[in-house]
Amino acid sequence: MAKFIMVVGTSSNSGKTVLVSGICRMLSNKGYKVAPFKSQNMSLNSRVSIEDGEIAVAQYTQAMAARAEPSVHFNPILLKPKGNFISQVIVHGTPYEDRDYNEYRSNKDDMLEKIKESIDYLDTNYDYVVIEGAGSCCEINLLKDDIANLRIAEISGADAILVSDIDRGGVFAAIYGTVQLLPENWRKLLKGFVINKFRGNIDVLKDGFEKIEELTNIPVIGTIPYDETLILPEEDSQALEGKRVFGNLKSPIEVNIVKFSKIANFTDVDPLSSDCLMRYLDFNDDITGDILILPGTRCSTVEMDLMKKHGMDKKIMEFIERGGIILGICGGYQTLGKMLIDENFSEGDVGTISGLGLFDMETTFGNKKAIKNSTGKISIFDQNFDVAGYELHEGYSVSNETPLISLSRGFGNCGNSYDGSFKVVGNSYIFGTYFHGILENFEFRNYLVNIVNNRKNLSKIENDNYAEIFNKNMDKLSKLIEESLDLSKIIK
């Protein structure tokens, strides 16, 4: 049987995801078989599990931290917002149905049974299960329907840790208020407090530690210092609020990313950030970079409509005339074609709309969702290399262009043997693919960046370090947590 540990928070973005990742890596480093778990997550950022099911990217990342094969049991319920208070409900990796909030809440017992199935599976197959809560664990207007926080600790028998972000201010009030608002049976599950993102001399907190322990009879088990050198994947699009420029700020190569209104899988661009200056563009911004990325989105037709309304479509054509390089990923790839056909309005209120017309391609929506871990080979010019990625798309595309990838596994454009499209227009290179994670393949990433390096007479890059950077930072996080927290009474 597994030992269950749960991390809950006083608010959203308090540090739950990072703390779970660090504990998973710490336990894995000690030789234990570890699984992350989040009963219910709401996110447009998802990846594909070992079973070809869809799970939140946070639980996928935590699985990598735990050195575990990502499973649908790590995130049995995934809610993907579609707008108008409706979400696509993913159960054990498979699309279940679309529900509005009231429908979903009234059927929470059905979802709870699915969650219990996963808890039983993890209990049988792992030494430790590290659970992440959602948002604040004491939203008193939601407690009776909350199936993502301390009800899960109660079901699994987990010891719970409450984490709060001191960087926001009011940390002791947040901790005390959270404890007081919890029902007594859930309050008893809390075994310790963690204060996250502290800067400065910890001695200034000691009086606060003593007082909060006196008031709650729960100990502060540690303070995690703020470490701006840690490079960790973001969980969802909230992290993009106010984010404009990031990456290698000294790089002579600039990558622009169109900030779609319903952007999904935005971490696809992260592998470029060590070598390039990265800049998000709003629809009315000018394209200033060498490379333009049209990323994934929940609603391709909506984004295409917005690009037209704000003149981004014309700016993309001017970028092509200047010899720009374009990469469209999933929904962004679909906008590169001639037509996006959505007769049943499955993508939103726009319906059928013409695309950018850079590819001789039509995409039809309303199909069964393709959810695949995919592999194949890119053979363009003198390049010939293997690639891997994952697919999450309901649009099927028929393209008359040169395929970008010959598939050995996957669905690709429309269930044939090919994925993506590739085209050269003058000095411009246009790439499109359904492969999320395409830039994690160092040969393709380097090829893309080196087109610009050649034009600017810069040295070629030969980096293959994305996985290495991830693991280095996870080990650093693990060490930071082990040195900062006293988990001896929780991890037995």
Swiss-Prot record:
Domain of life where this protein originates: Archaea
Pathway: Cofactor biosynthesis; adenosylcobalamin biosynthesis
PROSITE patterns the UniProt entry points to: GATASE_COBBQ
Record flagged with keyword Transmembrane: no
Catalytic residues (UniProt): 330, 436
Family the entry assigns: Belongs to the CobB/CobQ family. CobQ subfamily.
Protein name, per record: Probable cobyric acid synthase
Primary gene name: cobQ
